[in-house]
Structure formats: structure tokens, C-alpha cells
């Protein structure tokens, strides 16, 4: 399974949103590896704890966290990396401030990737397989009416891009049993060419002069309150409030045409999570976990077409706006998910652990088309309501310190999102 059948999570906040598609995604690159503390992978259906989209498993990214110290401490880090295979240059700078009552972690990372190059040893015997004989030089303001011969067919032209990632975290211990974490993340890329489309042929010639994803931008602001009352009814718990803003766009133009098509999407995601643990025995060999999640997605999809103005092989501007079919309903869309869950764990003995849980999820999707120039629909609105009750039963056996055997029986589900029911045209 891939894409919207696998759930991506960063610091306890789900990254999957209403427009995650079933094709290949590049959203994971918006979390810089230089800012990661660890990554956890959960295989198989995990819908009881994580909800919809966790059919194929969960990938949970944990970014680096600041820590307090009895004495004032300042730590700085610098990383620089260069790769010859695609002329990669990555630079990362970080600073951690540790004080008695608060701490901060700041990091900025920049990466630049050149065109990919394939190996020249072709032991499989297909001498021409994968080679790129021609490519489009229509990059930036350059205009070329025809395709260009590739001087080195082993280089996949128009595959390079760059991106910047910023991470800012604050940690404030409000009391011995209460902590506050503030998490700010921002990621932005350059235009990202779509190589498969730029290699597509029509009558033996390249079809597209331009086809690229516009700058992919992700902003996250999250606040997490951790409590440790150590009571019989509640040992510990966390409240997480988060806001995300995601911007994507697709731009394309065919050879032999001056018409350039722009499609832009923006998603605002508001979410609230609560996760709590209750010990059922003094030795804590049995505990009960429970929680809730509310997530609301607001989607805006707009599109337009423009005629490029060309002078001496340079694009000097645009004129003659025309209508283009939007990727998603142009009247706006929303996706609401609410859920509650209960999970029970018991250590049967020193080597065996039993785990079982149940989750109830309700999802609601609404969308509306306004402009029906290209589409004539029997209904101009979509209203979908789904609910699901999922169960899980797991058993863990540890025969030795170095071995662990896991078994699980679980039901999973995935509620259709806007990409499933409201997308028009290409992926």
C-alpha cells in the first residue's frame, strides 16, 4: 500500500489531509532528516490508535526536542554534505538553549539537488533502456519551441530542485507534573519538475514543454500540554492543539502551444488530540489508555490559464487569461473527522504481553462545484458521512532479551477523502 493508505505523523500530528492522493507523494521530504531525532514505523493496520489512512501502517517522525538544564547551556551544531551523484549540497545549522525554567531548539536546513544520473554499466543487455535522448529547455523564463538533444542521455534533465526547512521548538516545565511544548515547522521548495510527464511522447516527440509542481509549502504550529497527575484515574496524558497550512500547485504547457495552465490548492487543517493512560494495578502490569481526536480540513482549489508573451526566446509576461478546470471542486471543500478510542494492555508474565483496543470514528465530507464550463454534473454538491468501529487484538512474546515475536489481528478502515471523490484530471 502507498500514499493515502499509509499514515504520516510528525510529533503526534497527522500529516495526511483531505487531498492526499493514491499515487506517489513527496510530502515526506517536508520533514528534513537533519532535524529528526528518530522515526518509528508501525506495520499493518493501526486504525485503533491512529484512525483512518493507517491501513498499510504508520510512519511517525519525531523531531529533535530541547531539554532544560540546571546551568545555562548553549549548544550549536553545523552539518554540511555534498553528493557527487546528483551534485547535492545540504547545509544545516542548529542551536539549543537550555535553562532551568525553559529551553529552545532552533534549526534551519537548506538542500540543493541537481539532475539525477543513471549508471553507465548496462549489464542487463538493454543498451537504450532508460536513456533520455531529448529534453525540454523551457525552464524559468527560457522559451524553446522544440525539444533539445541531450548531450548525455544518462542524465535525467529537469529533475533537480532545492528546499528550505525551519524548525523552532520551546519547552517550558510549568510545574513538576505539567510541561508545555511549542512546535513550529516550515518547509518550502523550489519548483519540482515532473520527470515522467516531461518524458511523455506524442507522435515520437516530447509532449510537454513544461510540467512542474510549484513550490510545495508546509507550515505547522502545534502546542502540546503534558500532564502527570499520577492519580488512580489518570497517571499521565497529553493535549495537542495544531494548525497546518499546506500549499501545492501544478503548472503545465505543451510544445506548440503558448497556453500555460495553473492549478493551485491550499489546505488548512485544525486538529485537537487527547491521549491518556490509567494504571489499573500498583505494579503497572495492566493499564488502560483512552483518547479522542478531532480534525477539520478546509480545502481551496483554484485554476487559471494564461498566454505567455515571448520575445527573442524569453518569456516576458502573460496575457489573455482563460478558464481551466480546477483539480478539486472550486466552490470549496471540507473534511471533518472525530474519533474516540480505548486501549487495554496487560503483562501476562515477564515474557508475554496482551494488547486489545477499540475505536469509533465518524467522518464527514462536503464539496461544491460552481463553474460547470467543463463538467456538467447531475449534482453540484457532494455530502458523504461515514462511521467505522475498528478492533485490534495483539500478543507479544519475548523468548530472550534479543528476540521479540509480535502477532496481531486487527480491522482497519479508510474513509474516502476529497482526492477519492472530487478530483478531476491528472494525479
Model-found features: residue ranges?
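Extracytoplasmic beta-strand/coil segments of soluble accessory domains associated
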Residues: 1-14
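N-terminal periplasmic accessory domains that precede
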Residues: 8-9, 25-29, 41, 54-77, ...
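Short acidic/polar hinge/loop motifs at secondary-structure boundaries
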Residues: 14-45
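Extracytoplasmic loops and strand-loop junctions of Gram-negative outer membrane beta-barrel proteins
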Residues: 41-42, 74-77, 125, 148-154, ...
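Transmembrane beta-barrel wall of Gram-negative outer-membrane proteins
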Residues: 86-112, 123-190, 217-219, 282-283, ...
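Flexible, surface-exposed loop regions and adjacent strand-edge segments
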Residues: 121-130, 136, 187, 196-207, ...
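Face-selective signature of the C-terminal outer-membrane beta-barrel domain
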Residues: 173-187, 215-372, 387-388, 392-404, ...
